[in-house]
């Protein structure tokens, strides 16, 4: 599989600002890291047009019953696993809706699996196991843009007719070949040469945040800026759900708590009850008639 020569990979260049890094005192190291990190959000901002295209593709896919599948290796894969894992509790979606594949499997989440990222064959095997379909979106994440596991996944996904997206720090890398949408965030060389868990990793986390969050907002899993579909799986989250309901409805805590009980702790249903002055059965009927569109059910 072709690779990008190291002299052309920005992620492998030496950073002139950190040339004497090992001689710096602690605070100087931290200030340098902080200065470099400030560049990341700006660089991500330059990619908003591409990120927006990816979000719209994800929204369209999920509306058709498709899935968002992240693919990465090492730090990139771990960030993918993290983002996918947070979607069910935050937005109330099925764990199948947003998934992540990491080279080396579950063991690679907490430790290095030697050679896993070099296996192109395993990427195809892993996507076959997911029963990849045309309605799915596959997002390959690789700072270098040359990771065989990720490149193979994108090539296979494109052949299957799925939408393909690349997140990289090297625009001219091979990862762009099979990606219909390329999100190339140029964060410049790392302060520790080649350590892409730093700025490149931070940029990946920001982009993943944007992809999943904006998609879920567009899909109606947020009301105003409130997590209306939050999973109420522990006491902290049950209290948060109560606060969300009081803020969204304007009702006092006692009234909101009663509505939650009446609705079977369904936040959407409870909100329709309180804002429209109806009982749980009527609220449920309005949501069904609106096909789950909360604002439509509320008449807003």
Residue spans for each PLM region:
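Cofactor-/ligand-binding subdomain signature composed of acidic, glycine-rich
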Residues: 1-43, 47
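Gly-rich Lys/Arg/Thr-decorated short loops/hinges at beta-loop-alpha junctions or inter-strand turns
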Residues: 32-40, 100-111, 223, 264
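Active-site pocket-shaping loop/turn-to-helix segments
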Residues: 42, 49, 111-112, 200, ...
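A short, well-structured juxtamembrane/interface segment
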Residues: 46-61
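Aromatic/hydrophobic pocket-lining residues that form π-stacking "cages" and hydrophobic walls in ligand
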Residues: 57, 153, 211
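Glycine-rich phosphate-binding loops that contact phosphosugars or nucleotide phosphates
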Residues: 69-206, 215-217
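Short, amphipathic alpha-helical interaction segments embedded in low-complexity terminal/linker regions
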Residues: 210, 215-300
